[in-house]
Amino acid sequence: MSYQAVIGLEVHLQLKTRTKIFSSCPAEYHGAEPNTFTDPLTLGLPGTLPTLNREAVELAMMFGLSLNCDVSGFTQFHRKNYFYPDAPKNFQLSQYDRPIARDGFLDIGSERVRIKRAHLEDDAGKLTHPTYAPYSLLDLNRAGTPLIEMVTEADITGAEQARAFLETVQAIAQALGVSDATPEEGKMRCDVNISLHRAGEPWGTKVEVKNLNSFRSVARAIEYEVSRQTRVLGAGGRITQDTLGWDEGGQKTFVMRTKEGEADYRYFPEPDLPPLDITPEWIERIRARMPELPAQKRERYLSTGVRAAEAQTLSLNVALSRFYDEALRAGPAGQQPDAQKLANWLLTDVAGHLAAQDQNITQSALKASHLAALVRLIDAGTISGRVAKDLLPEVMQGQDPETLVQERGLSVVTDTAAIDAAIDAAMAADPGTVDKVRAGNTKAMNALFGPVMKAMGGQAKPEVVRERLTRKLGL
């Protein structure tokens, strides 16, 4: 009997606040010189006292509500004690037994992943270990920035489900504006707890893989650990409860330390911060501020006729969905572009151009109204799809497609005499194909269709060309 994976995630999001969680020190340090975004509290100097950041609390409440959690009416902070250079206070302020949110869920496709808790805490500094150097470098700019840590129940069963879950969490955080949630900047980090068991048997010993900073790394670490633990258990070995790191170059895990338990941290209530009471009225004010969430956006797109795959892709990308919504609203009343066709153009043709330029939609000169106009021109039969594709590079540079079509005379040719002349020329140039078609090989007609469309510069409607070509061939 094969083993089944039991996976839980711990996701850390850096909240998008102006200042750090317990002091007035600015929180947006990215790109700054090391140790330039610090203050006495960040440095852990004696006599400094924390003051809780209200903005961080409200962002955490909003995030908890988006995960279908219950927001606690009473919460408090505890000291999590440990000695490490990146924590100059020698403790982290976290929420131990009274998190700000608990008992939520997210639906990933047809599967539900339960959210155990989400709690606030301050981040640590950053240690860098130069190769072969007898020292380490410490940057405390990150220390004290607000984090929300979300912990799932062990409901995840595989790497792709974990990846889809993280993509959904990222989309929610970005839609709410609570976090940039960019793994490449360290603003979204993930720890993975993995164990194996056979169906009907107790769960096995779990390991924790720490500080995975990309969704791809999460998926690969899970795949590697499932494979490794399967080999160990299959050979009669035992899994030890270790904390593991992920070697991106070697694509494997390595032991960092033996896993600590809660007793090792000696939690106790923070004496310098009073407990926080959160009233129902405060919760409802936060709920009223919440924008449309990805799941709601997906349902809205489906209701307009967008296919499930495109609706999912759009709903998980904040920038693309904003651009799409703007394009969908563009134009005179009653003349909006077809929703599915617009999605196709944005996610296929436009996305291809952006990828070739190593850009995202916010960096492009493309205007939503211009993409909408391009799709409307196709819908109205004013231009063909081929002409639209030829125009797209210029439209991507900010050109108005309607102006380009008018100035260059690119409208669809409706003159059947011109189409018939192009057909006659193609048939005269390839009599062998004409004979094949008339002998019953109708597929050979495509060899005539292409030259006709080329002669018309892509400005003839394909269905008109095919109908008149069929008539000319006597079919």
From Swiss-Prot:
Entry protein name: Aspartyl/glutamyl-tRNA(Asn/Gln) amidotransferase subunit B
GO molecular function, one term: glutaminyl-tRNA synthase (glutamine-hydrolyzing) activity
Protein family membership: Belongs to the GatB/GatE family. GatB subfamily.
Sorted UniProt keywords: ATP-binding, Ligase, Nucleotide-binding, Protein biosynthesis
Catalytic function, reaction form: L-glutamyl-tRNA(Gln) + L-glutamine + ATP + H2O = L-glutaminyl-tRNA(Gln) + L-glutamate + ADP + phosphate + H(+); L-aspartyl-tRNA(Asn) + L-glutamine + ATP + H2O = L-asparaginyl-tRNA(Asn) + L-glutamate + ADP + phosphate + 2 H(+)
Organism, as annotated: Deinococcus deserti (strain DSM 17065 / CIP 109153 / LMG 22923 / VCD115)
EC numbers, comma separated: 6.3.5.-
Subunit structure: Heterotrimer of A, B and C subunits.
Domain of life: Bacteria
